[in-house]
């Protein structure tokens, strides 16, 4: 496993829509955007950005900041100008927030809002990624794909533990755009409201309404929504329609909030 020089991300079209602000969704900790293709029509153009280092299992030595810079450049190349929404599931929401910071002074593209899909506030784990509970994977998934998912998940734990969103925005002397938080209703199987085990990092702050963001010092989340299922189940076949409706509503409501310009 070696480091890769300057990977180039691609912005993939997931849905076409009307004149509403386009939504750019960033990959989750697994590194892929397959789940976003399961979303029902959101009434807007939707793009997705996957981890360009997923296939080769190479590291982001520059952390969340390096990932965000890579995806920021890809968005500028694809969209060019206008108001957009950015967001993502889990890790994707955290990266999206940093992408919004990189666009804070951009004259052509303005991030009007951020959507966090069950994205807890970054916290340091006391165990290695190998000890964390991985999401259920399709039985027929090839071994090399399983390896890529496991590598991406382990790295995500380290990247999130080392990331401080507040410090990043303070260095830029900017405030984040308004955000909407969609949170899963349930705990992972084996987890609970009083479980603090690191295998269940995504549930450690589930008792808090803003999943820990209330302690971030950023004060940017304007609305919260709930989605049926646990963290790994909100995109399941039985829950994705409800999640889609909630995401559509969150985006529509973000559009009418003052986005700072």
Curated annotation (Swiss-Prot):
Top-level EC class as recorded in UniProt: hydrolase
GO molecular function, one term: hydrolase activity
EC number: 3.1.-.-
Keyword hit for Ion transport: no
UniProt cross-references to Pfam families, sorted A to Z: Thioesterase
Entry keyword annotation includes Hydrolase: yes
Biological function: Thioesterase; part of the gene cluster that mediates the biosynthesis of the antifungal antibiotic FR901469, an inhibitor of beta-1,3-glucansynthase, exerting antifungal activity against the pathogenes Candida albicans and Aspergillus fumigatus. FR901469 is a cyclic depsipeptide containing 12 amino acid residues and a fatty acid chain. The NRPS frbI contains 12 modules responsible for the formation of the depsipeptide backbone which is denoted as Acyl-Thr-Ala-Tyr-Val-4OHPro-Thr-Thr-3OHPro-threo3OHGln-Gly-Thr-Orn-OH (C71H116N14O23).
Stated family: Belongs to the AMT4 thioesterase family.
Protein name (record): Thioesterase frbD
Gene, per the UniProt record: frbD
